[in-house]
Amino acid sequence: FYRMLRERLTGDAVISVQCTSPLVAPQSYWCIVKTLEAVGFRVRPYHAAVPSFGEWGFVLASPRPLPETLSLSSELRGPSRFLTDKILNSLFDLPLDLARVEAEVNRLNNQVLVHYYDQEWGSLK
């Protein structure tokens, strides 16, 4: 899926992928990041505290390098009670307990992501 998506993106396209909780399921989270990297995406992992889910992970991905510092465009600067340039950039500052861990690339022939999900989320029973 990600390979086909990458082939169809044009120009400076950027996608955001909702991954999972990098705190509860670090291998699952980093497996998704690594899978995006494996098909040629440049990635910027990030996280946010979501009230109904807790610490949640996402990743920005693009065929082109992503800037180290992001700025809200004027089109996105409508009324916001939360998001500022400073807060936006802090989302990409992963604390040590969310640091990258070893994980395999998810493929159709290994479905390792399913194993990671079962192992990590199943341990919460």
What are these model-derived regions, one by one?
Residues 19-28:
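Acceptor-substrate binding/catalytic loop of class I
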Residues 2-3, 27-47:
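Conserved Class I S-adenosyl-L-methionine
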